[in-house]
Amino acid sequence: MNNDLQPIVLVDEEGIETTFNVVTKLDIEEKEYFLLSPEGEEDVVIAMQVVQDEDGEETLAPVENDFEIEMIEEAYATLFAEEE
């Protein structure tokens, strides 16, 4: 786990704020991803991609593409294996 990344707060569609711990950041095929774990729920990990919104600002969007999820899982497994 990359401990030098600070927790982030995300706001859902209903305006509810949730704090997430950053498990790690991955750069895959010129795209940037964050693996996030809701605070207090270390067994849950959510993959988010850095995207630009309509104003050109960087924001996070959930990864829903099965191919991208598989790439992220493989990259994370490789990273985890290297840390052991």
Swiss-Prot record:
Tree of life domain: Bacteria
A Pfam family that the UniProt record links to this protein: DUF1292
Family recorded in the similarity comment: Belongs to the UPF0473 family.
PANTHER family registered for this protein in UniProt: UPF0473 PROTEIN CBO2561/CLC_2432, UPF0473 PROTEIN CBO2561_CLC_2432
Protein name, per record: UPF0473 protein CPE1777
Lineage: Bacteria, Bacillati, Bacillota, Clostridia, Eubacteriales
